[in-house]
Each structure stands twice: as C-alpha cells, then as structure tokens.
Amino acid sequence: MALSLAISPCPNDTFVFDALVHGRVPGAPPVEVTYADVDVTNTAAERGAFDLVKVSYAALPWLLEDYHLLPCGGALGRGCGPLVLTRGDRTDLSGATVAVPGERTTAYLLFRLWAADQAPARIEVVPFHEIMPGVAAGRYDAGLVIHEARFTYPRHGLTALVDLGEWWEGDSGLPIPLGAILARRGAVDPVEATAWIRESVRQAWADPEASREYVLAHAQEMEPDVVDRHIGLYVNEFTADLGEAGFAAVEALLGRAADAGLVPQTSSSRATAWTS
C-alpha cells in the first residue's frame, strides 16, 4: 500500500525526497506525492491528511498528538532565515500592511517575536509567490519571505529591513528551525520512515545529478544557479540528523513562543520524536 507524502515543490524538498519518491530506497513502500506550499500542508496535517508531511516547526504544538517528529529530512540551519522586505528605506513596521506566507509558519512566528514592540496595522496571508511582486507593486508595505527569495529579492527592487535568521541566531546562539518532517501515528513506523528518509538524503548527496530533472521540473521557473544555491543552503547536516543543536533550537523557539502566548505549551520536542 502506498504512503501519502506532502512536501513543497522547493528544491530542498525535491532533492531530499527524490530517491524515496522514485522507488530507489530499498525496503520503502511506494509513495504518492502531493506538492503544496507549507501553509497548505500545515492545515492538511491538522486533519491527518498525510502519512508523511513537511510542516512548519511553528505548527508542531497543534500536531504532535497525531504525528511523530522525525529527526531528519527537514529544513534547519544557519544563515537561512526569513527576510522582511520593503520597497524603500522604511526603518520599522508601525502602521504597515505586511504580507506573510501563513499564520502558522515558522517565518511568521519569528516575525511576531521580533516585532513584539512594533504594531503593523494589518497582516495579510498571501501565497508565497505573490509576496515580492505585491510589495514591489505597492499592494503591501512589507513582505515576509523565505527560501529562494533571499537570492532573488533585489531583482524586484526590494530591500531587506531585517534578516530574521540573523536576529534569531544572534539572540539565541542557535540555528533556525524552519520545516519539519512528521510521520502520522499509526500509519507509518517512525523508525522505518527515518531510515528511508536518511537513505534518500544519502543518495541525493552521493549523486546530485540523479535528481536534477525532477528538481528543476518543480522549481517554479528558478534558474539552475539559484536552485543550486538553494539546495546548498537548506540541505545540510541537520537534514540528515537534527542532533543536539537542532533539537535545542526547536525547543528554544517553541518555548519562547509559548511564553509569549503565541503557541500552546507543549512537551519537549525531543520527547515526542524518534531519535537514534
């Protein structure tokens, strides 16, 4: 029986999951894939819609009752945080209309922690690919962006008001937890799922060209050099194993957010994960 998998079409996800999706991981079952923005997968996971699913770490407090957090396959690192973009030389967001990619995304959670002493007039949830054009056209005063936008935003005539990754790393000393891989309880063994994903990651690193056509086919018109930079930044040591620093980052982010009343209190992410 095929497992249902939901990931984004972003190059880091398709690179990581190429071998698993295409049946090259020994012992793994067939996989049926859905590609969607993380705001969509966050919502779908609340309904238990997928066996394996990529979600925002910010959504974990609402999901861990039904899902295991896997210690691999996700997006966590340094120098890869969300950016707040504007058209001009704005120095704060007081009274601004800000476009964000989702209310339960890690990007928006980091934004709320950073902007605690500011008061944007309005927050609008906007599909990720519409944020930069919308800010450039003046529909929004600022936009919160992730992933490949850090490489391409100057083309839209935009400037970075703040790099939330730099802010988080400087404030906490920890890497930035962005996207997690979850396994639905009762549907898939988390130990087996972890082994499959780690083997898929191993194959991706061993032969990057094997996934090239698949990655580019889903890369939303990204140039090959941007795709390569994207993969190089977001697929890293934490993709293979969250490790001590990775789990510490997740626990620090969710703990700080819970203390601020932004997410429900939850047990340690380590206690709800399968780890080797």
Model-derived regions: residue spans:
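Bilobed "Venus flytrap"/periplasmic-binding protein-like clamshell domains
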Residues: 2-22, 80-142, 146-151, 248-251
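A structural signal for short loop-to-beta-strand junctions that line the ligand-binding cleft
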Residues: 4, 66-74, 97-98
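A local structural motif
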Residues: 24-35, 115-126, 263-267
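Hydrophobic/proline-rich hinge and linker segments of small-molecule sensing/allosteric domains
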Residues: 69-90, 168-185
